[in-house]
């Protein structure tokens, strides 16, 4: 079970985008693609066969998972993730500061 999943809201805790918040769009092995964070400009060549216009395109690049923390909406701060087994046997993610279940 991963600590950060697709759809989670995260805060960048270090690097050039420190303090920015965004939603996780994609989870890679050790990196995350976060909406609006680590945006790079790519020079794209036109491809008439695919119908792609050329030019400078802004693309969201992956950021290392260690540089982000999950956002706790109750405290409005970055938080750490822990795991807890419920009475019915399900393993769920919880916020370390408050103990409440993430995504419930």
From Swiss-Prot:
<dbReference type="InterPro" id="IPR041988">
    <property type="entry name" value="Ribosomal_uL24_KOW"/>
</dbReference>
<protein>
    <recommendedName>
        <fullName>Large ribosomal subunit protein uL24</fullName>
    </recommendedName>
</protein>
<dbReference type="InterPro" id="IPR005825">
    <property type="entry name" value="Ribosomal_uL24_CS"/>
</dbReference>
<dbReference type="InterPro" id="IPR008991">
    <property type="entry name" value="Translation_prot_SH3-like_sf"/>
</dbReference>
<comment type="function">
    <text>One of two assembly initiator proteins, it binds directly to the 5'-end of the 23S rRNA, where it nucleates assembly of the 50S subunit.</text>
</comment>
<dbReference type="GO" id="GO:0005840">
    <property type="term" value="C:ribosome"/>
</dbReference>
<dbReference type="GO" id="GO:0003735">
    <property type="term" value="F:structural constituent of ribosome"/>
</dbReference>
<keyword id="KW-0687">Ribonucleoprotein</keyword>
<comment type="subunit">
    <text>Part of the 50S ribosomal subunit.</text>
</comment>
<comment type="function">
    <text>One of the proteins that surrounds the polypeptide exit tunnel on the outside of the subunit.</text>
</comment>
<dbReference type="GO" id="GO:0019843">
    <property type="term" value="F:rRNA binding"/>
</dbReference>
<comment type="similarity">
    <text>Belongs to the universal ribosomal protein uL24 family.</text>
</comment>
<keyword id="KW-0694">RNA-binding</keyword>
<dbReference type="InterPro" id="IPR005824">
    <property type="entry name" value="KOW"/>
</dbReference>
<dbReference type="GO" id="GO:0006412">
    <property type="term" value="P:translation"/>
</dbReference>
<dbReference type="Pfam" id="PF00467">
    <property type="entry name" value="KOW"/>
</dbReference>
<dbReference type="InterPro" id="IPR003256">
    <property type="entry name" value="Ribosomal_uL24"/>
</dbReference>
<dbReference type="InterPro" id="IPR014722">
    <property type="entry name" value="Rib_uL2_dom2"/>
</dbReference>
<dbReference type="GO" id="GO:1990904">
    <property type="term" value="C:ribonucleoprotein complex"/>
</dbReference>
<keyword id="KW-0699">rRNA-binding</keyword>
<dbReference type="Pfam" id="PF17136">
    <property type="entry name" value="ribosomal_L24"/>
</dbReference>
<keyword id="KW-0689">Ribosomal protein</keyword>
């Amino acid at each position: 079970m991963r600590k950060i999943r697709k759809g989670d809201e995260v805060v960048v805790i270090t690097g050039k985008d420190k303090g920015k918040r965004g939603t996780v769009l994609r989870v890679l092995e050790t990196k995350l693609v976060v909406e609006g964070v680590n945006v790079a400009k790519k020079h794209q060549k036109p491809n008439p066969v695919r119908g792609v216009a050329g030019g400078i395109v802004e693309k969201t690049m992956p950021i290392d998972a260690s540089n982000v923390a999950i956002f706790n909406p109750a405290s409005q701060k970055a938080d750490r993730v822990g795991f807890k087994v419920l009475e019915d046997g399900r393993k769920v993610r919880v916020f370390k500061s408050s103990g409440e279940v993430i995504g419930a």
